């Protein structure tokens, strides 16, 4: 308590934020929204920085470094989630954002990359020690920023005894491994000691990717990844809700360029040893032996066969693909909601393209159908990486069932176009912008200053949620046809 005042009750030690006494937040920080969300959130901030880097890369870098400083990061390595619950868990996107800002800034500020890298080693270790309860490389991160996407609040223990093994948490950690691997390889080009750390993340990625594909998260019948409820007896029950949870494994992809192994001999030697002596992981790292375009090598959770099956659903306009981007939940759940009983509690997930119909997380956020920019952006970036490996000969139907074939680069371009169209005058609607489709408060001749809403209607593209969420929806600036993040890891 305060000096000279009565001591607060002992129950304070059980309340939120009680373990964050080290915090001293007295800095200029990018806010998600100065009106509805005037507080920082670590994963929002990471996306803000990618948009900000196009106009002020110095500020973007300062923001990413700031959250890693000792007056923000917990001594155990956790990054603060957001101000009302510092100890909650958000997706680990800080490394991805640092790499993207590094790239936008011309791939020249190695000091910045090194500063962030060293602190993120602590954060990665926190994740492994705290969120992999069984030590089997399958993770349980909680709600991970996706609020009501599941049948129950993933921040809490499942209604039934056991653990929720999460497709998205495990995929995020595989992605985190690849981000830190890329950082280490970039730094190793200037300091060979980083080759040792690069090897660590190559191997750890392999362990996580193997677990992802062998411990029940992949559903062979549906061709999709799901969360799995594992009871105390070890029995697994997949929660067959087709949502962004099953698309996040696409993010775990990296391309090693053809000359990398020649330039980093220690890393190459150890990698070849691992491949030769660990045949149980061959399914995960098989494409290391199979050069793609320009001798590129592929590291990914999702191999070509599963990639094609996932994309068949993702690019289906009756499921994820809308006129204005990818929905957060398959539209198939409009006519076929997911229903089940978990621990005696009846649960249901419906397709809800607009505001949430459930009270989870206050009801003002909804991941059961709307389009959200951050994850759409990461899908697009991942497709561009796959394109670099497969080239123009590997195509999919776009949209599914149309008979029109497209390369993965063309799919990425089309998704970018659909997202940008939210803010552009629609000639088929009298010049009205889809973002304003839900309201007459904004006339058709509104000036060229559309609002960047928090999320968007899954069928119409209308802006929803916070109306000034310029932060991560500002990622639309990174979708312009310049400066794309489709490069291989070149070191």
Where are these regions (language model features)?
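Acidic, mature catalytic/reactive cores of soluble proteins
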Residues: 1-491
